[in-house]
Amino acid sequence: MRLRGCGPRAAPASSAGASDARLLAPPGRNPFVHELRLSALQKAQVALMTLTLFPVRLLVAAAMMLLAWPLALVASLGSAEKEPEQPPALWRKVVDFLLKAIMRTMWFAGGFHRVAVKGRQALPTEAAILTLAPHSSYFDAIPVTMTMSSIVMKAESRDIPIWGTLIQYIRPVFVSRSDQDSRRKTVEEIKRRAQSNGKWPQIMIFPEGTCTNRTCLITFKPGAFIPGAPVQPVVLRYPNKLDTITWTWQGPGALEILWLTLCQFHNQVEIEFLPVYSPSEEEKRNPALYASNVRRVMAEALGVSVTDYTFEDCQLALAEGQLRLPADTCLLEFARLVRGLGLKPEKLEKDLDRYSERARMKGGEKIGIAEFAASLEVPVSDLLEDMFSLFDESGSGEVDLRECVVALSVVCRPARTLDTIQLAFKMYGAQEDGSVGEGDLSCILKTALGVAELTVTDLFRAIDQEEKGKITFADFHRFAEMYPAFAEEYLYPDQTHFESCAETSPAPIPNGFCADFSPENSDAGRKPVRKKLD
C-alpha cells in the first residue's frame, strides 16, 4: 500500500465549505505521533536545568497546588448541582481571584512566564460553550485555570487527591462510565446550563476528544454542538522552537513531557478567542454539520488543514496485536475511506469470508475500478478512487483484490493479527497445501502493516527451517506462538518509525483530560484505549 502525498483530493481548510460532502485528505504527518529529537546543545541544557531549576520549579508548582486546595475545598462545599447565585457573592469573587492568582503563579513557576491572549472572551450570556482546539497536552488546562470555566470530566476524576477538589470547584459536568445514560444526561445538562442565561459558568470543551500533534484538526465530536447553542471557538498555540508540550499516543510519555517542559527556560503559549459562532437552523438540526463548520473556522485561524481522522482511527493504531502499525501506515487513511463509503466494520467482518473467497477465485488476477466497486458492493465515487489508488502502487489502473481484503480484515479486527494472517494464507496459498513463498508473505505483511516497503527475508528463513522455499499458515502460527515478539526482531528491529504506540504503563490514564460524551461513541463492549504515562 502506498499513500501518494496528501491524496488526489486534498484541499485546504478554507475550501471545505459547509455543504462540502467530500472528505478531505489527511495531512502528511500522522496526527497521533510526536517525535522529539534534541540537539547536543539542547541535551546539555536539559542536563543543567535538571540539576538546578527543575527541582525548584517542581516544588513551587506542588506548593501552589497545596495552597489552592483548602480554598477550593471550602468553596466547593455544598451541592455542585445547585444553581450559582447571581450576582456571585463577594467571598466567591475573592476565592476566584485568589485561585486564579495561585494557578497563574504555578504556571509561571513552570516557565509559562507570559500567556498571550488575543481576542475577547465572550460573556456567558453570549456563548455558554467554549470549544478549544487543537487539544495536544495536559498543559491545555492553562485556559481553564485562567478563566475558571467548567469542563466535562470523568466522574472518577473527583476522587483524585487535591486535583479532584480543584476540579469540583469549577462545577464540572461529570460523565460516568458505569451509567449507561450518562452521555445523554451530560448533553442534557450542558443544554440546561447553556439555556440558563449566563447563570452557570461557561463550559470549555475539547471537541477532538483526544490529543494530537497540532499539525491538523481531526474530526470534532458532536457532543458540544448537540445543544444547538452558540459557541465561542478558542484556538491554542505553543510556538516554542522545541516542542516539549505535545502529548500524543505515540511519543514521549506524560512524565517525560513534564520533565522536559520544566527544563526549558521559557515556554510560550497563545490563546486566541475567535468571534462567537451562532448556528443556523440547519446546523441546529445537524450537530455533525455544526461541528464541521466550527472546525473549519478554527483551522483557518490556525492555518492548518483538517482531516477526517477520528479517535477511533487512533484506537486502530493502538490495538494490541503481534503486528504493530507503524507511524506512517496507510491503514489510517484506508479506515477513513472505509467510513466515508458507509461500510460498517461490524458488517464487513461478517462478510470477510465471502470477500476472501471472491479474491481467492481471482488467484492474483488484477481488476479495474469498476470490478473493484462491484466486489465491495459500492458505486464508483471519488472516495472509492482514493481507496483504489492506495493499492494501485504502479499507477496501472489495476489492483489485487486480495490486498484490499487483508486491509479490511485489519480494520475490522485490528487486535486479531493471526486471524488476518490466516485469512491471507487462504487467499494467497497454493491450492494443494495452502503454502506461500517469500514474495507472497512480503505482500501479506506489507498490506497488514499498510506500508510500501518491507523486508521479510530473515523472517521467512526463520520460519522455513527445512528450506523448502514455502511455508504454510501452520508453520507461521507455530513460529508466532514460539516467538510472540517476532515482528520486533525480524521485521523492524532498526526502524524507529515503527516505534510502538501501545506501551503499557503501570497506572495508565486517558490521553487528554476532557472526557468524551458524544452519544454515538458509547460502545460499552469495546475496551477503552489508554495513554501511556511514561
Swiss-Prot record:
Binding-site list for Ca(2+): 392, 394, 396, 398, 403
Bias-annotated ranges (Low complexity): 7-22
Lumenal side: 79-534
Stretches of the chain found on the membrane's Cytoplasmic side: 1-57
EC class (word): transferase
Function: Exhibits acyltransferase activity. Exhibits acetyltransferase activity. Activity is calcium-independent. Catalyzes the conversion of lysophosphatidylcholine (1-acyl-sn-glycero-3-phosphocholine or LPC) into phosphatidylcholine (1,2-diacyl-sn-glycero-3-phosphocholine or PC). Catalyzes the conversion 1-acyl-sn-glycerol-3-phosphate (lysophosphatidic acid or LPA) into 1,2-diacyl-sn-glycerol-3-phosphate (phosphatidic acid or PA) by incorporating an acyl moiety at the sn-2 position of the glycerol backbone.
CDD domains xref list: LPLAT_LPCAT1-like
Predominant location category: endoplasmic reticulum
Lineage top rank: taxon: Eukaryota
Organism: Homo sapiens (Human)
Motif (HXXXXD motif): 135-140
Gene Ontology biological-process annotations: negative regulation of phosphatidylcholine biosynthetic process; phosphatidic acid biosynthetic process; phosphatidylcholine acyl-chain remodeling; phosphatidylcholine biosynthetic process; phosphatidylglycerol acyl-chain remodeling; phospholipid biosynthetic process; positive regulation of protein catabolic process; protein catabolic process
Compositionally skewed regions (Basic and acidic residues) per UniProt: 523-534
Membrane topology, from the record: Single-pass type II membrane protein
Entry note about domains: The HXXXXD motif is essential for acyltransferase activity and may constitute the binding site for the phosphate moiety of the glycerol-3-phosphocholine. The di-lysine motif may confer endoplasmic reticulum localization.
Name the record gives this protein: Lysophosphatidylcholine acyltransferase 1
Pathway(s): Lipid metabolism; phospholipid metabolism
Matching Pfam families: Acyltransferase, EF-hand_8
Keywords, alphabetical: Acyltransferase, Calcium, Cell membrane, Endoplasmic reticulum, Golgi apparatus, Lipid biosynthesis, Lipid droplet, Lipid metabolism, Membrane, Metal-binding, Phospholipid biosynthesis, Phospholipid metabolism, Repeat, Signal-anchor, Transferase, Transmembrane, Transmembrane helix
GO cellular component annotations of the record: azurophil granule membrane; endoplasmic reticulum; endoplasmic reticulum membrane; Golgi apparatus; Golgi membrane; lipid droplet; membrane; plasma membrane
Enzyme Commission (EC) number: 2.3.1.23, 2.3.1.51, 2.3.1.25, 2.3.1.67
Protein family per UniProt: Belongs to the 1-acyl-sn-glycerol-3-phosphate acyltransferase family.
